[in-house]
């Protein structure tokens, strides 16, 4: 059995609405919500986006993959 790179990689998901609100002078949220998860590189070659709960926005928002 050939051994190569592991297709599963660890990725960090960051709330997209917190990032937008944090850029303004009036900061509505005290922080940025981040989740750590894994994705299969073969099945999902592009950026991963999941709808997760953001404790700073108090609602479900889209969390996008960020680079390390």
From Swiss-Prot:
Its main location: plastid. Signal peptide: none annotated. GO terms for biological process: translation. InterPro entries: Ribosomal_bL33 (IPR001705), Ribosomal_bL33_CS (IPR018264), Ribosomal_bL33_sf (IPR038584), Ribosomal_zn-bd (IPR011332). Keywords: Chloroplast, Plastid, Ribonucleoprotein, Ribosomal protein. Pfam families: Ribosomal_L33. One of its GO terms (molecular function) is structural constituent of ribosome. One of its GO terms (cellular component) is ribonucleoprotein complex. It is found in: Plastid, Chloroplast. SUPFAM superfamilies: Zn-binding ribosomal proteins (SSF57829). Disulfide bonds: none annotated. It comes from the Eukaryota. HAMAP family: Ribosomal_bL33 (MF_00294). Belongs to the bacterial ribosomal protein bL33 family. This is Large ribosomal subunit protein bL33c. It comes from Nymphaea alba (White water-lily).
């Amino acid at each position: 059995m050939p051994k190569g790179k592991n297709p599963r990689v660890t990725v960090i998901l960051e709330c997209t609405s917190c990032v937008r609100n944090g850029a303004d002078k009036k900061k509505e949220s005290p922080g940025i919500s981040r989740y750590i998860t894994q994705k299969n590189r073969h099945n999902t070659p592009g950026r991963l986006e999941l709808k997760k709960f953001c404790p700073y926005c108090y609602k479900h928002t889209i969390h996008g993959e960020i680079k390390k």
